A protein has these predicted regions:
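Extracytoplasmic/luminal low-complexity segments enriched in Pro/Gly and acidic/polar residues
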Residues: 242, 246-250
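A bilobed periplasmic-binding-protein/Venus flytrap-type ligand-binding module shared by bacterial periplasmic
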Residues: 220-237, 247
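Short, membrane-interfacial amphipathic segments enriched in basic
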Residues: 7-20
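Extracytoplasmic "Venus flytrap"/periplasmic binding protein-like
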Residues: 108-198
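N-terminal targeting leaders characterized by basic, low-complexity, disordered sequences
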Residues: 1-4
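Aromatic- and glycine-rich beta-strand/loop motifs that create alpha-glucan
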Residues: 20-29
């Protein structure tokens, strides 16, 4: 017998009964299916409401060794306004749950691998970090950062020349040398001052010192820490990333 026919037969037995008996019959025989259907409806409604309230991520990056403060929202609201982003339906994802620390090899490797994975799927637009963290990211063999000479106009580069972070591309070449000729990262001698390209063999500007941004300092409890920001070479949102760098320089 089909399920629907069984229901019709069962209800025919109680159709002339009082409402109370009908309800008792229904509850005795169909309470489990009814509860299951109710749960499915509740979950479906909850899923629809959650999806409708979820903001679309239109920009993302990593803030390494940073801690979020109550000022973070105000910082990003300022950028949304400058970039024409609708903060009601769109948002930026700034991942500050990552660390890169001197002597913490495993921790650093995990962080770098997470960043590289995000860059590989074009889900990362920028990286911000203190001098040590930024150096570790700059000198990965994957060349994560874009050459700012190809990203920002000459006027901006000239105006902020004393704030540019340079990496020595000759070191990356050594890391990517043929097997047998490679040099271990720990054995390399990195530039002592990333703002002095004249001390490097093949300097490339990949970051900007934005430590003077008071709202950024307050947003992530930086307490005067030197912070560099660089654009990711694989970004799928280059124009928005340019706007972000220019916003930080204002």
């Amino acid at each position: 017998m089909k399920f629907i026919d069984r229901i019709k037969e069962d209800w025919s037995k109680v159709k002339d009964k009082p409402a109370k008996e009908k309800w008792e019959f229904f509850w005795d025989y169909y309470k489990i299916p009814a509860i299951c259907i109710l749960l499915v409806v509740v979950l479906l409604v909850q899923s629809i409401l959650t999806s409708s309230n979820r903001k679309a991520i239109v920009f993302s990056g990593f803030a390494i060794n940073c801690k979020i403060s109550i000022k973070e929202e105000a910082f990003w609201d300022g950028f949304y306004e400058a970039a024409g982003i609708d903060g009601e339906t769109q948002t930026a994802a700034c991942y500050s749950d990552v660390q890169i620390m001197p002597g913490q090899i495993q921790l650093n490797n995990n962080t770098v691998q997470r960043i590289i994975a995000g860059c590989a799927i074009q889900d990362v637009d920028f990286i911000a970090g203190d001098p040590y963290a930024f150096q570790v990211c700059a000198y990965t063999s994957q060349r994560l950062f874009v050459d700012l000479r190809e990203f920002l106009d000459e006027e901006t580069l000239a105006k902020y020349a004393d704030r540019l972070y340079y990496m020595d591309n000759a070191i990356i070449d050594m890391l990517n040398a043929p097997v047998g000729e490679q040099v271990e990262p720990n054995a390399l001698e990195y530039p002592k001052d990333p703002k002095k390209p004249e001390t490097m063999k093949n300097p490339i500007p990949v970051g900007i010192d934005v430590s003077d941004r008071e709202d950024l300092q307050k947003a992530y409890y930086l307490d005067g820490t030197t912070i560099y920001v660089g654009a990711i070479k694989s970004t799928a949102r280059p124009e928005l990333t340019k706007q972000f760098l220019n916003y930080l320089l204002k």
